[in-house]
Regions:
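Periplasmic-binding protein-like
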Residues: 166-173
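Flexible hinge/capping segments at coil-to-helix
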Residues: 32-70, 155-158
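Active-site-adjacent beta-strand anchor residues
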Residues: 47, 72-73, 99, 117, ...
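Hydrophobic hinge/microswitch elements
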Residues: 11, 15-20, 25-26, 76-130
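Single conserved hydrophobic/aromatic residue that forms the stacking wall/gate
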Residues: 1-9, 13-14
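Beta-alpha-beta core module
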Residues: 31-38, 42, 104-152
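Secondary-structure junction motif
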Residues: 54-55, 68-90, 153-161, 171
């Protein structure tokens, strides 16, 4: 995440002439040139298809969950997901069997395979995916809206920031 912080921060500083208006990311760049606000927060669950073996286990353990084959969704070409970083901190690792780059396809993959997906509760509910709780403490998923401080007083920027913030609030319902 340090490298990403550096890249996003550098990118926004380079583009401080209204070329880049917003970034939404779980990482807040460390820079005096950047402002941010939290727009999304949700807990993680483990999604599966309707008749998956995991749905038959009452109160699945972390080992029950980690024994499954997992789908990893990330727009980044490589690297760990936030959930993997947190699992690694407590000595656990997922068995990632498939990686895809967008969440739009993830529900179809989960509904038609034995794979499971660690993702947010709101995503599971919005896509009508059955899920089980993760029986260990994992920090909440947080996303931040990030912008260059030079855009702070711009009326169009304020309007767009408000639209983005409301869209994320609607997504959590």
């Amino acid at each position: 995440y340090e490298m990403l912080r550096s890249l996003v921060g550098s990118e926004m500083c380079i583009r401080d002439r209204n070329n880049l208006d917003f970034v939404v990311d779980p990482v807040i760049p460390r820079s005096d040139e950047i402002n941010s606000m939290k727009v999304f927060e949700d807990d993680f669950v483990v999604m599966h298809r309707e008749d998956h073996d995991l749905s038959k286990v009452k109160n699945p353990s972390i080992d029950d969950i980690l024994d499954q084959k997992h789908l990893h969704v990330s727009g980044r070409k490589r690297g760990l997901h936030l959930i993997d970083v947190e699992l690694d901190k407590v000595g656990y690792r997922r068995k990632v069997a498939l990686r895809c780059q967008h969440f739009l396809i993830a529900p179809r993959i989960i509904q038609s395979t034995d794979l499971v997906l660690m993702g947010t509760r709101s995503f599971a509910k919005r896509n009508d995916l059955p899920f089980v709780e993760i029986p260990i403490e994992i920090p909440l998923m947080e996303y931040f809206l990030i912008w260059h401080k030079n855009d702070e007083g711009d009326g169009g920027h304020i309007w767009m920031k408000d639209l983005i913030e409301r869209a994320f609030k609607d997504a959590q319902r």
